[in-house]
Curated annotation (Swiss-Prot):
It comes from the Bacteria. PANTHER family: ELONGATION FACTOR TS, ELONGATION FACTOR TS, MITOCHONDRIAL. The gene is tsf. Keywords: Cytoplasm, Elongation factor, Protein biosynthesis. GO terms for molecular function: translation elongation factor activity. Residues 81-84 are annotated as: Involved in Mg(2+) ion dislocation from EF-Tu. It is found in: Cytoplasm. InterPro entries: EF-Ts_dimer_sf, Transl_elong_EFTs/EF1B, Transl_elong_EFTs/EF1B_dimer, Transl_elong_Ts_CS, UBA-like_sf. This is Elongation factor Ts. GO terms for cellular component: cytoplasm. Belongs to the EF-Ts family. CDD domains: UBA_EF-Ts. The keyword Nucleus does not apply. Associates with the EF-Tu.GDP complex and induces the exchange of GDP to GTP. It remains bound to the aminoacyl-tRNA.EF-Tu.GTP complex up to the GTP hydrolysis stage on the ribosome.
Length: 293
């Protein structure tokens, strides 16, 4: 039978399940909402939905990259514990999903969840199966795909917890990977000073000026002190101004010039960003690893 949008809406309101799951259950039960709920409980969908409110701050970051390094996708998949995150089933799910995103040029998470994972099963179907089987909430939180016509995409993943993609014009694969590792370690705010958010600049100017004015020095001296403070700040938060972690005698800008290369764009994900959880300084781990190479 044809399932009306109103029936699907009612079932979603009662179960919290996704639209496709509700439509499928209603179709199989000829529009009987109570029977559909019972069916969803039997198949694990209802069990999965009960876990949907639990915080999934652990997980993994995975990358799919084309053989010619012209295209790459970075995806964050979440679960509740590190134990499950390292399990074969979760890793297989994340790995197959990121490949699907890149191969099908999927645009957003909603489209990904509705995409075919395997014959007769969507990505969200598989996600809910794993939730029901393993007993933890799981989510496909975000992903990004970079493509390059004239350059290459470099990538670096640290411990499945920090992931970086870098689009580089000029240079080679080794340089692209080095830049990606550097971004993982230093977490720059912007590629160049001109790209820094104006509200960030205004706030930093205000803070430093207020501090320097307490010295009682003349205005022109305070202006010089402020200029120096902002220059130091740029060396810390602007990618091109930062010192290369593998060679602190050289800035990223100088490194690029020596290879006649240009960074077009970069993306950095850190697992669980914005999710309330116990923090671990994985960036410091990358920094130590990079300096040791």
């Amino acid at each position: 039978m044809a399932v009306s949008a109103q029936l699907v809406k009612q079932l979603r309101e009662r179960t919290g399940a996704g639209m496709m799951e509700c439509k499928k259950a209603l179709t199989e039960t000829n529009g009987d909402i109570d029977a559909a709920i019972e069916l969803m409980r039997k198949t694990g969908m209802a069990k999965a939905d009960k876990k949907a409110s639990r915080v999934a701050a652990e997980g993994t970051l995975v990358v799919s990259i084309s053989d010619d390094q012209k295209q790459a996708t970075l995806l964050e998949a979440n679960c509740e514990t590190d134990f499950v995150a390292m399990g074969d089933e979760f890793q297989e799910f994340a790995g197959k999903t990121v490949e699907l995103v890149r191969a099908k040029a999927i645009a957003d998470v909603d489209a990904l969840l509705a995409a075919e994972y395997e014959a007769g099963k969507t990505v969200d179907d598989r996600r809910r199966e794993l939730i029901a089987k393993i007993g933890e909430n799981m989510a496909l939180r975000r992903f990004v795909t970079l493509s390059s016509q004239d350059g290459i995409i470099g990538h670096y993943v640290h411990g499945n917890r920090i992931g970086v993609l870098v689009e580089l014009k000029g240079g080679d694969a080794e340089l692209a990977k080095d830049i990606a590792m550097h971004v993982a370690a230093t977490n720059p705010i912007a590629l160049d000073a001109a790209s820094l958010p104006q509200d960030f600049l205004d706030k930093e100017n205000e803070i430093h000026r207020a501090k320097f004015e307490q010295s009682g020095k003349p205005a022109h001296v305070i202006d010089m002190m402020l200029e120096g403070a902002m220059k130091k700040l740029f060396s810390e938060v602007v990618l091109l101004n930062q010192k290369f972690v593998k060679n602190p005698e050289q800035s990223i800008e100088d490194l690029l010039k020596s290879h006649k290369a240009t960074i077009i764009q970069y993306v950095r994900y850190e697992l669980g960003e914005g999710i309330e959880k116990e923090e671990t300084d994985f960036a410091a781990e990358v920094m130590a690893q990079a300096k040791g190479q």
